[in-house]
Amino acid sequence: VNCTGQDLSAVPPDLPGDTGILLLSANRLVSLSTDAFLPLAQLQDLDLSDNGLVALHTGALLPSLRELILSRNALGALPPLQGLPALTRLAVAHNSLAALAPGAFLTVQRLQDLDLRGNQLRTLPQEAFVGLRALKDLDLSDNLLEELPKELLQGLQKLETLWLSGNRLQTLPTGFFPEGHLFAYVFLTENPWHCDCDLHYLRSWILQN
């Protein structure tokens, strides 16, 4: 169901019960509760981008939802990700996230694709992504990251692609990339890398991989 750009300030109450894909981008959904989607038991993909969204209240069980797009909104904090057991893709790009809590994604352990680019993240707790054993793609590009904890990627056994471009990173801690883990792609461009002995680990890792 395509409700893009309809100047909506609330979710339409008369959506077909068998809706699988719901496009609600470019509306005026400033504050929203996932309770609004409870009648849509088969809902798999939900696009809420470009709404000026400042608050998303979760908790209602949406058992089939696999993809949630929250990009280009005004979220200052990551919503609690409750009631989304099947979620595999989450996009919160181009919001105003300044921090992530440890274990922020423990309730969505099937997540495979996490897009956090274009926020205001300056640092991350080492447990930011704990529990995401199925995660394949992690995009942290175009934030304000100045340093990253050594253990950030530990436990992300399936991670294939990592974007760190466009941050303020000058170095990475020794052992940052898990020993023996093979990545398909790692993007490190557009950072002010400080070329001294502290960067020896990163240089060696690049040459080996």
List the predicted regions and their residue ranges.
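Leucine-rich repeat domain C-terminal region
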Residues: 136-137, 142, 146-150, 156-209
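Hydrophobic packing within well-folded, soluble alpha/beta domains
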Residues: 22, 43-48, 68, 87-92, ...
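The feature captures the LRR N-terminal capping module
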Residues: 1-26, 30-50, 55, 65-71, ...
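Hydrophobic anchor residues at the C-terminal helix/turn of individual leucine-rich repeat
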Residues: 13-16, 36-37, 58-62, 81-84, ...
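Consensus "Asn ladder" position of solenoid repeat domains
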Residues: 6, 24-27, 48-51, 70-73, ...
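Leucine-rich repeat
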Residues: 9, 30, 54, 76, ...
